[in-house]
């Protein structure tokens, strides 16, 4: 059964198209107009082994925030759609990811009950900016990215930085940890034939 989704969302602030194949091989094409966000979504798709195409046009001349958050909303919706009835999946996943001096952890429950927890980032990341050739990426949006993804995918997602100093490393480790946790959670478990829940539904 194909676990593919294509979701489009158009507002006055952005026009987003996301194509997602959960059973891909990490083939990724990202264009949001925010170079560092492109880099992060490329890492996410690659390390989750998803085939992921994202095309976003937004009001980045004002700021990249709208485009980043709206893209995360659509990505979450695509994930929910691609998961379908969730039969046979592992449901839970988690991963620790080091990046030089930084260590990040993510845990996922494909529960149908959206929830998000984000802890451990240094306070200075609220004001830090990663410059790019076009729109910059403000690391304060990390929380918005993962929260929008979790609530629209209807998953419980916990992301934490255990320690780290460089905002680039912290951000990238968080994205990669989420990617690896998602990869584990959405994989098929050969011992599970139905929905992995005592309720019989997720």
UniProtKB/Swiss-Prot annotation:
Pathway: Amino-acid biosynthesis; L-histidine biosynthesis; L-histidine from 5-phospho-alpha-D-ribose 1-diphosphate: step 6/9
A single GO cellular-component term on record: cytoplasm
Gene3D superfamilies given in the database record: Imidazole glycerol phosphate dehydratase, domain 1
Alphabetic keyword roster: Amino-acid biosynthesis, Cytoplasm, Histidine biosynthesis, Lyase
SUPFAM superfamilies, alphabetized: Ribosomal protein S5 domain 2-like
Catalytic activity: D-erythro-1-(imidazol-4-yl)glycerol 3-phosphate = 3-(imidazol-4-yl)-2-oxopropyl phosphate + H2O
GO molecular function: imidazoleglycerol-phosphate dehydratase activity
Localization terms from the record: Cytoplasm
CDD domains documented for this protein: IGPD
GO BP: L-histidine biosynthetic process
The protein's Enzyme Commission number: 4.2.1.19
PANTHER family reported for this sequence: IMIDAZOLEGLYCEROL-PHOSPHATE DEHYDRATASE (PTHR23133:SF2), IMIDAZOLEGLYCEROL-PHOSPHATE DEHYDRATASE HIS7 (PTHR23133)
Assigned protein family: Belongs to the imidazoleglycerol-phosphate dehydratase family.
Protein name: Imidazoleglycerol-phosphate dehydratase
Lineage: Bacteria, Bacillati, Actinomycetota, Actinomycetes, Mycobacteriales
Gene this chain is encoded by: hisB
């Amino acid at each position: 059964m194909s676990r593919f989704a294509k979701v489009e969302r158009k507002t006055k602030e952005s026009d987003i198209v996301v194509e997602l194949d959960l059973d891909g091989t990490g083939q990724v094409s990202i264009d949001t107009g925010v170079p560092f966000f492109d880099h992060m979504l490329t890492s996410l798709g690659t390390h989750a082994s998803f085939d992921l195409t994202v095309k976003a046009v937004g009001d980045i001349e004002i700021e990249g925030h709208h485009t980043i958050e709206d893209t995360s909303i659509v990505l979450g919706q695509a994930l929910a759609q691609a998961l379908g009835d969730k039969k046979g999946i592992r449901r839970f996943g988690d991963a620790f990811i080091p990046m030089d001096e930084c260590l990040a952890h993510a845990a996922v429950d494909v529960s149908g009950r959206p929830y998000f927890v984000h802890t451990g980032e240094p306070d200075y990341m609220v004001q830090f900016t990663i410059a790019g050739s076009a729109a910059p990426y403000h690391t304060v949006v990390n929380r918005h990215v993962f929260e929008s993804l979790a609530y629209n995918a209807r998953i419980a997602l916990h992301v934490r930085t255990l320690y780290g100093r460089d905002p680039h490393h912290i951000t990238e480790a968080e994205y990669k940890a989420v990617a690896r946790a998602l990869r584990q959670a959405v994989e098929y478990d050969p011992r599970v034939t139905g929905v992995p829940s005592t309720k019989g539904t997720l």
